[in-house]
């Protein structure tokens, strides 16, 4: 009896957590143009990534302009990598949602919203690439294909993919809170992109833990 009661209590707790996630998602919903971009542009007179992430301050042979340019190139790659991993994350969450189609509808809604957020993030990072690419020097190449990476990752077990996803979303939060948010010298739009990204991922990581069994 105790084991049955514990199981039922756990299922009830999980249902409550899914419900809270859905409520939070509805309150925090944002749109790229309406809430973030608003016809803004990147400030190329500033660094994009903080030195704490880029480690550019260790390259003492660079002058100020060179260090700033390298920070912007690294910021461009940083955004590209997030766009790349969002591809397999959105696909995996859609897969997870299928398990709830005839079961917990709040869990299904939470996962569909999660997937929609990841698709929105991919669009945002593509927009960033276009905007940054029009100002930065020619010659920059992106080698990894998001679909190839997604296929390779999704070939692993569900446990492994959810573990990877959870850890990615944990370091997203750490990077933003500890390294990006406190730095006033960074490009304001670059900071805001990762502020909005962080808002979603702080909710997503709770779903990762619920699905990661």
Give the residues covered by each predicted segment:
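Transmembrane helix-bundle signature of multi-pass membrane transporters/permeases
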Residues: 114, 196-201
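Carboxylate/His-rich catalytic cores and anion/metal-binding grooves
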Residues: 112, 116-136
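Inter-helical turn/loop segments and adjacent helix faces that build the functional surface
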Residues: 96-108, 132-136, 177-196, 211-213
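Terminal targeting/low-complexity segments that flank the catalytic cores of oxidoreductases
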Residues: 1-109, 130-146, 152-159
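Histidine-centered active-site/metal-ligand motif
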Residues: 121, 197, 204
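Short, conserved catalytic/metal-binding motifs centered on acidic residues
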Residues: 86, 118, 201
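Acidic/histidine-rich alpha-helical segments that form the ligand environment
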Residues: 78-85, 154-186
